[in-house]
From Swiss-Prot:
GO terms for cellular component: DNA-directed RNA polymerase complex. The gene is rpoB. It comes from the Bacteria. This is DNA-directed RNA polymerase subunit beta. Residues 1-11 have a biased composition (Basic and acidic residues). It holds the Pfam family RNA_pol_Rpb2_6. PANTHER family: DNA-DIRECTED RNA POLYMERASE I SUBUNIT 2. Keywords: DNA-directed RNA polymerase, Nucleotidyltransferase, Transcription, Transferase. InterPro entries: DNA-dir_RNA_pol_bsu_ext_1_sf, DNA-dir_RNA_pol_bsu_external_1, DNA-dir_RNA_pol_su2, DNA-dir_RNAP_su2_dom, DNA-dir_RNAP_su2_hyb_sf, RNA_pol_bsu_bac, RNA_pol_bsu_CS, RNA_pol_bsu_protrusion. Belongs to the RNA polymerase beta chain family. Coiled coil: none annotated.
Length: 1169
């Protein structure tokens, strides 16, 4: 039989086997990669961590800056984000300039709590920020300096997340249009002429737009207001007609505009502009001058930012310093010059001794879109807060006595703290972290989002913005993006991409010198890449690095493909997986999958639930190790040493430098999505470990490698039609042996508050509850750990004081004698919600004395309930190729088709799901999976050519059973290699080779033992269990909450709602003439308030079901018609007026008897029904 033991360690492959893609500390995989990669993968969380390091200016950032400067790079930020912002706001001066306040030297104190404490106690992981504030009295020269507390500043954890009020959040990077100058061309619909326009877009401030219309007039639009002649703007800047003609006289458009211009002096021009911008206000020369200055030339109001200045300089061929953050006259003149040259049909000009190419811009090009990473997003938010604080400081300067003023009395930090809180709590870009598995978290942190404040909106984004663009190559993955309304607006950073100081994404290339490829790596932005000719990573090379072929396949600007002579090649890709994201790079044989299915495969890997026993894929891509380690769910040894002590929740290592380090492991913690985070040691006492080696596995990892699913024996065949339309049949073995079982943890919490009638109390003493129900509660009224609970069970007993009526003298006497005991309370205990059950694994109690609780809360109790969910029909399974389906049937092992040696298959997939979907990768994975499971031994037989030679070159001529293999994307195993491995697969213990070289096996029907007439494809495929579990979707209701107005049941599982019987369903029953069933559905099962109570009563008492009454929605309709002043009367069949009474006494009597609450408020929770 095929070896089944999941805990058996995968064998190491034959010694000297292959190049290590994963690095020396990873489990060994036989790699089919043929391409030498000169560059390791960068740290996959660098996007988040390096950006935040820059913001706070910590030691790691300083070290990176020093290293970059030493390497001769000029494009690095030498001041941190917080430094920039405090420099920007300093000095704050009062109106007369007699005093000023400035800030410098920010520093952080150590955080008060560890990340784990913050998670447990609902705190924010933050550190106090202090800054030195200097107050200068300019008249006396006196300086007062103080260290001022600027609030608690949220810190990033090592994993690139923030912990805000106890929950892990991720700040997603935003893709926005870069500040700069953009030229575009549109076609006029009436005259069919080209209209050229241009926009100067700042980081903040007013836009300046220029346009040459169909009559060849050059117009300007200031701050999105009415269009004016461009010569008016030039004259407002102090130019006269002669100077304009001297500079632009060669261009017909400017001459035509000047002729039509009626303004002659600077003053007239300024007043003209003022009238158009501020209609209705009396224009004065000073006001007009100030207005124009404030719009474009005042650094407080207008900011191009460094990146904007860089783009403007680059586009227009200027040499202004990066510190020049406002517009200049030179910018405006150069822009006009460029626009009229573009209109005149010129293609290039020289400026400052450089050739400037004249062309329109593509707004979707990655040279014109930049990333606002975490650091910049938070920096912008602090800038807002400081601007609000600045206003307060100015006010206080004027009101306080100048002698008594100190920095502390001027500063109010509330607006700063509030703006940071607001960003982390409510911004669209601060998101609840996706923690289903390590890959989900990693991808979430590498996400690029074009939505959000200052970005696009779903509704307005057109097809062009969403489409794949040639400049995405190596920067943003063309495959991984959501399906649905956000398609193309949310992407994922490519594996090798990095962000430069200006926020543009760069990707690495190997330099090619004189037709020879070197190992020198240059990072290029999308703009720089356009100027070069680039070869693919798989271009064949000779030993000396020269190209082996006479014509090399390259790509040029705009995605054009061409064959050229090797000497004209400038660069070469560093790696075949350079263009895809991490999730996509985990799909083996990606090159054989249709892109739509690959997209689903990438997205579904993020929904895989951590299983009870993780198993690394037999067929991987070599990315598994880095993905798991960088995601941070694997524990890594920080120093080399010897393991001293190992327990389930801690590992102690004695390092070589004499220090001891203890690593604490997370045990059965709940993730944001309710999956289970559990780490387990994978080292033994006395074992030697190296720095960077995994010492404990986390969820979805095995041996430090990402392990999202299980390797299952699959047969592609139809079975009695049960796997029709993507349905899946699985063997009962997967249920029995917990192969696809997972643990899910739910958190339930209850708090005891102060109410107007007195404090709530957590107690075991609950009114009208039997001792039997309280059996599992301890003396405090809290459930014991280890108790099995089902829906409706009490987790925490709690009573709330009831409203009191006037007391009788006897009651007052009792109250006086016995104190508070006789007070009326009602049961408001925390109960297990419908549809949930499991085992209590943890209870946390917080009281006012030992924890900071919100105001009004005296005690807080959290109960964690875990459930083990076995795989069941209705659960969703998927492979890595977008091949997804729902389990339709679980067959006993003895009924499953079996191989010649009696091994039953685990899972049956429909072969018709493959050709139409064009994801053939799953078939190749199946065959290679079989070869990897069986092992192989290839004899050269004196013919080392073709696939045998290739296998010999990578040292993979033999491998024992259960060998892990890697087939990297675009550089994996070829079809002939897989065929060869199947031919040479090792036989089983009986000497049988069950699968032929075509990958097919003879299968037998488990029910009859007869062989199937045709051979069937059999092999091992990696299957994941997705988060869409049937237990979470199943829902039932008899009675429950009703809507306040219509009195119809609410909808949805969350509201404990009913099943909607809609308009079309009503038609269906009408068509069958099922009148009584329909009447029942529309009245007593829905909104006939009287009827439904009477029916309940009749069922309880065993009587006949009464006639339905009038539905509430009919009464609502009548009321609405009356509101339209229509006199509506309801007549019976004999013409008598029907009285529409409100719910009568009889109903209330029956309801009270049956314990049904008829009050019309909507219950706030399921328990109150």
């Amino acid at each position: 039989m095929v070896d089944r033991e999941p805990w058996k360690e995968p064998h190491l492959a034959a010694s000297g086997s292959t190049s290590m893609i994963n690095g020396p500390l990873a489990p060994h995989r036989v790699s089919f990669a043929k391409i030498h990669e000169p560059l390791d993968l960068p740290n996959l969380l660098a996007l988040q961590i390096e950006s935040f390091d820059w913001l706070v200016g910590n030691d790691a950032w300083k070290a990176r800056v020093e290293a970059a400067l030493a390497a001769g790079r000029t494009d690095v930020n030498t001041s941190s984000g917080l430094e920039e912002i405090f420099e920007e706001i300093s000095p704050i001066e009062d109106i007369s300039g007699t005093m000023s306040l400035s800030f410098r030297d920010h520093r952080f104190e150590p955080p008060k709590n560890t990340p784990d404490e913050c998670r447990e106690r609902d705190f924010t992981y933050s550190a106090p920020l202090f800054v030195t504030a200097e107050f200068v009295n300019n008249t006396t020269g006196e300086i007062k300096s103080q260290t001022v507390f600027m609030g608690d500043f949220p810190l990033m954890t090592e994993k690139g997340t923030f912990i805000i009020n106890g929950t892990e959040r991720v700040v997603v990077s935003q893709l926005v249009r870069s500040p700069g100058v953009y030229f575009d061309r549109t076609v006029d619909k009436t005259s069919d002429r080209d209209i050229y326009g241009c926009k100067i877009i700042p980081s903040r401030g007013a836009w300046l737009e220029l346009e040459i219309d169909k009559r060849d007039n050059v117009g300007v639009r200031i701050d999105r207001k009415r269009k004016q002649s461009v010569t008016v703007l030039l004259k407002a800047l102090g130019w006269d007609d002669a100077r304009i003609l001297e500079r632009f006289g060669e261009f017909e458009a400017i001459r035509a505009t000047l002729e039509k211009d009626h303004v002659h002096t600077q003053e007239e021009a300024l007043l003209d502009i003022y009238r158009k911008l501020r209609p209705g206000e009396p224009p004065t020369y000073e006001a007009a001058q100030t207005l124009l200055n404030n719009l474009y030339f005042n650094p407080k109001r207008y900011d191009l930012a460094k990146v904007g200045r860089y783009k403007v300089n680059k586009k227009l061929g200027l040499d202004l310093p990066y510190t020049q953050n406002t517009l200049t006259e030179e910018d405006i003149v150069a822009t006009i010059d460029y626009l009229v040259r573009l209109h005149a049909g010129q293609t290039e000009t020289t400026r400052n001794g450089r050739t400037v190419i004249i062309e329109t811009d593509d707004i979707d090009h990655f040279g014109n879109r930049r990333l606002r990473t975490v650091g910049e997003l938070i920096q912008n938010q602090i800038r807002l807060g400081l601007a609000r604080m600045e206003r307060v400081v100015r006010e206080r300067m004027t009101t306080q006595d100048i002698v008594a003023i100190t920095p502390q009395t001027l500063i109010n930090i509330r607006p700063v703290v509030a703006s940071i809180k607001e960003f982390f709590g409510t911004s669209q870009l601060s998101q609840f972290m996706d923690q289903t598995n390590p890959l989900a978290g990693l991808t979430h942190k590498r996400r690029l989002n074009a939505l959000g404040p200052g970005g696009l909106s779903r509704e307005r984004a057109g097809f062009e913005v969403r489409d794949v663009h040639p400049s995405h190559y190596g920067r943003m993955c063309p495959i991984e993006t959501p399906e649905g309304p956000n398609i193309g607006l949310i992407g994922s950073l490519a594996t090798h991409g990095r962000v430069n100081a200006f926020g543009f994404v760069e990707t690495p290339y190997r330099k090619v010198i004189n037709g020879r490829v070197t190992d020198q790596v240059d990072y290029l932005t999308a703009d720089e890449e356009d100027r070069h000719v680039i070869a693919q990573a798989n271009a064949p090379l000779n030993e000396d690095g020269s190209f082996a072929e006479e014509r090399v396949l390259v790509r040029r600007r705009g995605g054009e493909v061409d064959y050229v002579h090797p000497s004209t090649v400038d660069y070469m890709d560093v790696s075949p997986r350079q263009m895809v994201s991490v999730a996509t790079a985990l799909i083996p044989f990606l090159e054989h999958d249709d892109a739509n299915r690959a997209l689903m495969g990438s997205n579904m890997q993020r929904q895989a639930v951590p299983l009870l026993r993780a198993e690394a894929p037999l067929v991987g891509t070599g990315m598994e190790f880095r993905a798991a380690v960088d995601a941070g769910d694997v524990v890594i040894a920080s120093k080399a040493g010897v393991v001293e002590e190992v327990s389930a929740d801690a590992i102690t290592i004695a390092a070589d430098d004499g220090t001891r380090q203890t690593y604490r492991l997370a045990k059965f913690r709940r993730s944001n999505q309710g999956t289970c985070i559990n780490q387990k040691p994978i080292v033994d006492e006395g074992q030697r470990v190296e720095a960077g080696q995994p010492i404990a596995d986390g969820p979805c990892t095995q041996g430090g490698e990402l392990a999202l699913g299980r390797n299952l024996l699959v047969a592609f065949m139809s079975w009695e039609g049960h796997n029709y339309e993507d349905a899946i049949i699985i063997s009962e073995r997967l249920v029995k042996e917990d192969i696809l079982s997972s643990i899910h943890i739910e958190e339930h919490e209850v708090d005891a508050r102060d109410t107007k009638l007195g404090p709530e109390e957590i107690t075991r003493d609950i009114p009208n509850v039997s001792e039997e129900i309280l059996a599992d509660l301890d003396e405090r009224g809290i459930i014991r750990i280890g108790a099995d609970v089902v829906p409706g069970d009490i987790l925490v007993g709690k009573v709330t004081p009831k409203g009191e009526t006037e007391l009788t003298p006897e009651e007052r006497l009792l109250r006086a004698i016995f104190g508070e005991k006789a007070r009326e309370v009602r049961d408001t205990s925390l109960k297990v919600p419908h549809g949930e059950s499991g085992k209590v694994i943890d209870v946390k109690v917080f009281t006012r004395d030992d924890a900071e609780l919100p105001p009004g809360v005296n005690e807080l109790v959290r109960v964690y309930v875990a459930q083990k969910r076995k795989i069941t029909d209705g659960d969703k399974l998927a492979g890595r190729h977008g091949n997804k389906g729902v389990i339709a049937k679980i067959l006993p092992e003895e009924d499953m088709p079996f191989l010649e040696d009696g091994t039953p298959v685990d899972i049956i997939l429909n072969p018709l799901g493959v050709p139409g979907r064009m994801n053939v990768g799953q078939v190749l994975e199946t065959h290679l999976g079989w070869a990897a499971k069986s092992g192989w031994k290839v004899e050269l037989n004196g013919q080392p050519e073709g696939w045998r030679k290739r296998l010999a070159d990578i040292g993979a001529l033999d491998a024992p059973p259960n060998t892990l293999v890697a087939t990297p994307v675009f550089d994996g195993a070829k079809e002939d290699e897989i065929r060869g491995l199947l031919e040479n697969a090792l036989p089983n213990s009986d000497g049988l080779r069950m699968v032929g070289p075509d990958g097919k096996a003879r299968l037998f029907d488990g029910r009859t033992g007869e062989p199937y007439p045709e051979p069937i494809s059999v092999g091992y495929i990696y299957i994941m269990k997705l988060h869409h579990l049937v237990d979470d979707k199943l829902h039932a209701r008899s009675t429950g909450p009703y809507s306040m107005i219509t009195q119809q049941p609410l909808g949805g599982k969350a509201q404990f709602g009913g099943q909607r019987f809609g308009e079309m369903e009503v038609w269906a029953l009408e068509a069958y003439g099922a009148a009584y069933a329909l009447q029942e559905l529309l009245t007593i099962k829905s909104d006939d308030v009287l009827g439904r109570v009477k029916v309940y009563e009749a069922i309880v008492k065993g009587e006949n079901i009464p006639e339905p009454g009038i539905p509430e929605s009919f009464k609502v309709l009548v009321k609405e018609m009356q509101a339209l002043c229509l006199n509506v009367e309801v007549l019976s069949s004999d013409g008598m007026t029907v009285e529409m009474r409100e719910t009568d006494d009889e109903v209330f009597r029956a309801a009270e008897e049956l314990g049904i609450d008829l009050s019309r408020r909507e219950p706030s929770s399921v328990e109150e029904i």
